[in-house]
Design a protein with these regions (language model features):
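Extracellular/surface-associated beta-sandwich interaction domains
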Residues: 1-173
Length: 173
């Protein structure tokens, strides 16, 4: 990027569509759910239910070593089943979305973004959705996008990334 003189790039992900499930009793599902290019009245698409991360080799946030620890991560919890600290998950301890803040604003427990609480390392994340049930032979469609933008400094690139994401969301919708 230095030879292109476009600044520090930013990358982001957006969860466009989750699996299709039946609507709950009394829930307005007049819009219906999307699946494989078809609208399904009386159904809904699940939204992302949690976002968790782990760090390869970190003593606190290390990789899951069995299915129970992996399942905790899929629920937006740490591998031992405890909640993430509020520096990561925000002031609401029921928050299941790590780093949901706006990186263009100051980091705080009201705006958690990936700060300097642990050194740089092999970081991984999970965009989770559920629960839902699938029988053998069932099909589901989950759609997400991965975006890249570069526009000046790091924060300018994040602002541009948000514009790119908004355009992609509009195109998908």
């Amino acid at each position: 990027y230095s030879t292109l003189d476009v600044g520090t790039p930013a990358a982001g992900y957006d969860f466009f569509q989750g699996p299709m499930v039946d609507c709950d009793a009394g829930e307005d599902c007049s819009v219906g759910a999307k699946m494989f290019g078809t609208n399904h009245p009386g159904k809904k698409n699940l939204s992302m239910s949690s976002f968790a991360f782990y760090i390869n080799g970190d003593p606190t946030y290390t990789d899951p070593s069995d299915e129970i620890e992996g399942y905790y991560y899929m629920q937006g919890l740490r591998k031992d089943g405890s909640v993430y600290p509020n520096a990561i998950a925000g002031d609401d301890y029921n928050q299941k979305f790590c780093f949901y803040g706006d990186p263009s604003l100051a980091h705080s427990t009201a705006n958690p973004v990936d700060g300097n609480y642990t050194p740089s390392a092999d970081r991984r994340f999970l965009m989770n959705v559920g629960p839902f049930t699938m029988a053998p032979g069932d099909s589901q469609e989950v759609v997400f996008g991965i975006f890249h933008a570069a526009g000046g400094g790091a924060l300018a690139s994040v602002a541009y990334l948000m514009e790119v994401d908004a355009l992609a969301q509009t195109a998908y919708d």
